[in-house]
C-alpha cells in the first residue's frame, strides 16, 4: 500500500509541475506576440536610420569632424568591443548556449591576433557564463529589465559612445539571437561600428539628402547606435520567449507522458494487490 501512496504522490507532483510549465508556455506565447508586434513597428525606423548612416559614408556628402570620424573609421591598435546579449532568466532551452559559444570562439581568435578586447554583457546568464574566464575583459554588465528597456538602451548607448569617443575601442560588434519563429532562433553577429558602407551605388543614386546644422551628424550617430541596440534587444527578447515557450511546451508534453506511465504503473500495482488478495481469499475458503 505504501508503494501505491508513493505513486499517487508522484502523479500529483508531476501534475502540479505540468500546470506550471503550461502556464509558463502561455505567458511566453503572449509576450512573444507582443514583442513581434514591436519588431514590426520598429523595423522601418531602424532600417531608415541604418541606411542614412551608410549613405553618409558611401557618397561622402558631409565633411566629418575628427570626433565624428571615430564612428566611421577603424582606428588601429584599439580594442574591439563585444556586446553580448543573453537572457536574464533560464528555462529557455539552448537560447544562451550558441551566443556564449560564438563569443568564446571570437575572443580566442582576437587573443591569437594579439588584439585588445572589451566586453559589455547584457543579461545575467551571459555574465555568469563569462565572468570567471574573462573577468579582465568585462567593462560593463547590465541586467535586463522585466518590462521597459528605454533606460537600458540609453545606458548601453552612452557607454559605447564614451568608449569610442575616448579612443578606448574602435570596432564594435553585438551578439544576439535573431527571431525566425518560436522554434528557430538564429545566432547573429552584427557589426555596429564603424558604420559599414554601401558598395552598390545603384541603391543610393536616387536618394538626395541635405545635411544642415552643427550637431546633425552627432545626433544621427546617437540615434543609429540606439536603434542598433534596440533592434538586437527586440530580436533577442522575441527569441528568448519563443525558446522558452518551446521548452515549456516540451516539458508539458513530457510531463503528460510521465503521468500516463505512472498511472499505468499505479493501475498495474493496484491490480496486482487485488489479484493477490483474491488468491488469498480463495485459498482461505478452500482450506475451510
Swiss-Prot record:
Q: Does the keyword Nucleus apply?
A: no
User: Superkingdom of this entry's organism?
Assistant: Bacteria
One cellular component term (GO) for this entry is: plasma membrane
Q: What is this protein called?
A: ATP synthase gamma chain
Tell me its family: Belongs to the ATPase gamma chain family.
Subunit structure, as described in the record: F-type ATPases have 2 components, CF(1) - the catalytic core - and CF(0) - the membrane proton channel. CF(1) has five subunits: alpha(3), beta(3), gamma(1), delta(1), epsilon(1). CF(0) has three main subunits: a, b and c.
Q: Which NCBIfam families match?
A: ATPsyn_F1gamma
UniProt keyword Secreted, yes or no: no
What keywords does the record list, in alphabetical order?
Answer: ATP synthesis, Cell inner membrane, Cell membrane, CF(1), Hydrogen ion transport, Ion transport, Membrane, Transport
Grouped into one coarse class, the protein's main location is membrane
This entry's Gene Ontology molecular function terms read: ATP binding; proton-transporting ATP synthase activity, rotational mechanism
